[in-house]
Amino acid sequence: MSIMRVSALAALSAVSSLSVAETPAAAQDKYAQRKAFVSQFAGETKSSMPFFRSYDFEPLGDDALLLWQSPGRAYLLDIEDFCPDLPSAQAIAINNKGSTVNARFDTITVLTRGQSAIDRCRILEIRPVDVKAMKAAEKAGRELDKNANTGG
């Protein structure tokens, strides 16, 4: 079993994207928007992906996960039904054999503060993400927001 631990800073940033006063419906909407954005840059479904270690992860609600293998390589994972603790995950464990993660066979285990890891959530779909294009679109969006806010 390969385990990816998230640094305190990375875990904080994943959780801090949701404000304390945010309603569950607003949080789900935010995850849905982010998942839709990431999906635009996700390629064709793959039956498996190489896996040696992870760099980071980003929950996209309780049914999807953006798994970063490096700053320039990521995969969009769709998860079976739903994985209720995924949005508040401090870390995840990828339960696989060898150096490959297989859709429909392998699972993730969500690790949260104060809870033992009991839920295994099956990986249904694996899609590679065009990280370069996604980051360019994010940068362009920030520039548009900046120009709109400054009147430029």
Q: Which stretches of residues belong to each language-model region?
A:
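Positively charged n-region of N-terminal signal peptides that target proteins for export
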Residues: M1-R5
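Bacterial N-terminal signal peptides
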Residues: S7-S17
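N-terminal secretory signal peptides
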Residues: T23-P87, E143-G152
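Helix-rich interaction surfaces within compact, conserved domain-sized segments
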Residues: C83-G152
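Generic detector of short, well-ordered, non-transmembrane alpha-helical segments enriched
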Residues: V15-S17, P50, R122
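Ligand/cofactor-recognition surfaces for anionic moieties
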Residues: V20
